[in-house]
Swiss-Prot record:
Signal peptide as annotated in the record: none
Top-level division of the source organism's lineage: Bacteria
Family: Belongs to the UPF0311 family.
Gene3D superfamilies xrefs: 2.40.160.20
This protein's name: UPF0311 protein YveG
Organism in which the protein naturally occurs: Bacillus subtilis (strain 168)
InterPro entries, A to Z: UPF0311 (IPR020915)
């Protein structure tokens, strides 16, 4: 039997993303649509890539009847060496059943009661960061009243 090498998660970067409160579009046939047209005010990235998150990103959320939230965020990082990297970060957030009503009311739920994972992808014209196109990444996130905290791992 051939043993396939198991993937390893290597810490890549930590992001602190300053966000605005959501604008709720309302109940649609798919669920409660919350859209934040320009939620990202600023932020930082530390780790293998260092820099700042530029204002003006977009984030949309679909909150389903079972409490699951589908997330899609897009924003731009300006690295410390003045390169630009576009990030598209899709994922899910599921709150433990006992806390779903509070979450639906906009309350921040303690992270131990929330499964919040993402799959970020990167695009850049920078030669320095072209390698980001050829790697897979996953993220683990936490929401605070004003920030999304995101730790990204490279899948090796």
């Amino acid at each position: 039997m051939v043993l396939v090498k198991k993937p390893v998660l290597k810490p890549f970067a930590s992001l602190e993303i300053k966000v605005d409160p959501p604008i709720t579009i309302g109940e649609t046939s798919l669920g409660l649509r919350x859209f934040i047209p320009i939620p990202i005010r600023s932020g930082t990235i530390t780790g293998e890539v260092k820099g700042r998150i530029l204002p003006g990103g977009a984030d949309s959320q679909m909150i389903r009847a079972n409490g699951r939230t589908d997330l899609s965020a897009r924003y731009v990082i300006e690295t410390a060496d003045h390169e630009l990297i576009y990030i598209e970060n899709n994922g899910i957030r599921q709150v433990s059943k006992p806390f779903r009503k509070q979450a639906a009311a906009g309350e921040i739920i303690e992270p131990e009661h929330v499964y919040f994972r993402t799959v970020p992808t990167f695009e850049t014209g920078s030669e320095v960061y072209q390698w980001l196109h050829d790697r897979l990444f996953i993220g683990s996130a936490e929401r605070t009243p004003d920030y999304v905290l995101l730790d990204i791992y490279e899948v090796q």
